[in-house]
Amino acid sequence: MTITQPDLSVFETVESEVRSYCRGWPTVFDRAQGSRMYDEDGHAYLDFFAGAGSLNYGHNNPVLKRALIDYLERDGVTHGLDMSTAAKRAFLESFQNLILRPRDLPYKVMFPGPTGTNAVESALKLARKVKGREAIVSFTNAFHGMSLGSLAVTGNAFKRAGAGIPLVHGTPMPFDNYFDGKVPDFLWFERLLEDQGSGLNKPAAVIVETVQGEGGINVARPEWLRALAELCKRQDMLLIVDDIQMGCGRTGAFFSFEEAGVTPDIVTVSKSISGYGLPMSLCLFKPELDIWEPGEHNGTFRGNNPAFVTAAAALQTYWADGSAMEKQTLARGEQVEQALISITEENLADVKEYRGRGLVWGIEFKDKDRAGRIAQRAFELGLLIETSGPESEVVKLLPALTITPEELDEGLRTLARAVRETA
């Protein structure tokens, strides 16, 4: 692909230096449809990024777009705080009937604000309020958001340093396989909890991602998650699952914890819950935890009604037919895994490991700078991928769940070429 030099001057002179994704993809995007984005010069890019997981159903999904346009054309409420609206009712009914009831999940639904970190902040606040304790346990390489409470339970040193103040009341513990399986799971954690001389304040809750997306595609085993849930129950701690990136079908089932057979006390959901890339987040919790006073936690943009419209349409379109969406995602995931096996076999001296679940995969190279070079070459070849991990050492694959097998094969062949050409 021949890419002419785009005019990026206004971004470079007016926008803050904090911008990041645009540095790796130096073009001006103009439109998008399905699994492709197009720049101003008409160049097409196959998207294996999906808005960092906020576009599980692709760009400008036609069913969701039609529902949104119809709603706006009839002057439906756009901004509603937490007022009762027809759009919110339609979403809550769809979510209850299509997601919660079939899974026997009795969760109450809270709208904490537009973004994932809003959901995490509300989850941490609620856990502390319920238990009357301050400490929260998180895990190595976790990522839960960029606001101060979320940063306190995030592992990445670079992101934590941006807080500018001490990040307190968060205690990190080793994630699954952090010690390469050499140390029994939870041995250290449980010993600290039971030892009155350990110096560990009893936590209110444990927050965990079943797959650490930003942390490097670290996949927790189902048995590890079950053991964690049992430990929380024994020690009177709430279990919070952060399903912001891995929920909404990303790993196959709607919730990423379903495979493990656990029922978290609190669940945070965002990114693809709106289905269309519109800001929306949820904090779900067991009814007995709903001890909020009216208005005790709020936010101006927690009632994003256009997002409720597309969210309801997404649930009705993709999740009304039992396990069809889950089966499709798992089949696409097997296609990705087979391609990564081939790439690994062709680069045995260079590849450290590949790992993933559903349609989230990563491939790690022994040379920590290799992932960045691969992502850059992939962009030049018309494929959008990002890196993850504490040192950006993992190539991360996050295509839309609606991607076709042909598009997936095209992108995987481009990835293999980028790997070869950066050796």
Swiss-Prot record:
The modification N6-(pyridoxal phosphate)lysine is found at K271. It is an enzyme of class 2 (transferase). NCBIfam families: dat, ectoine_ectB, PRK09264.1. InterPro entries: Aminotrans_3, Aminotrans_3_PPA_site, Dat, Ectoine_EctB, PyrdxlP-dep_Trfase, PyrdxlP-dep_Trfase_major, PyrdxlP-dep_Trfase_small. This is Diaminobutyrate--2-oxoglutarate transaminase. Its EC number is 2.6.1.76. The gene is ectB. Belongs to the class-III pyridoxal-phosphate-dependent aminotransferase family. It comes from the Bacteria.
